[in-house]
Amino acid sequence: MSDVSARSEGRSRRRRLLAVLLRDREGTTAIEFGFVAIPFFLLLFGLIEIGLSLFADQILNNAVLDAARLIRTGQAHAQGFDSGAFKAKVLENMSGFPVSADRLTIDVERINSFSSYTPKTLIEDGALTDKTAYNHGEAGDIVIVRALYRWPMVSSLMKTNYADLDSGDRLLVATAVFRNEPFPWTTQKPGG
């Protein structure tokens, strides 16, 4: 038997084997796909959900930084901002992203010094507290701005493993700490 005929016979055997495998309709491929597909899709949807929450967190951070600039420069003081107006400004800065005003909590606090500040607890027993306030301070004051957004987790797997609150929501937090600028229409406090 020559080399050429041996190669030809080998090719023909492979073709016959491939044809037999392609005709096999016993369902092993579907079963194997089922074993692999379930973990694959769980992982895929989990990554998408975590990615969306991280994206929303970054949008919240940028929105808070932009809105906090109004406090730092005195524009919020001049326009008579309260908690609702500041919250509306944060939501406006998040426009184009599906957020709910009911899920956003704002806490703006004036503090005396960086060294003597003790943070207040905004989460107790797996839920947000109502200890939030709004005090944007005066020129030269140190201000802490916090925005807390209850991001809904869709899948039950993410609710049990990635959620911060008992409701199954992931708490997104954006914080800005700064000293107010000397507003042109007020005098700066001594030592400020």
Give a label for each model feature:
Residues S2-E92:
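Alpha-helical assembly-interface signal, strongest on the long, hydrophobic N-terminal helix that forms
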Residues S2-R7, R69-G192:
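Short, conserved structural patches
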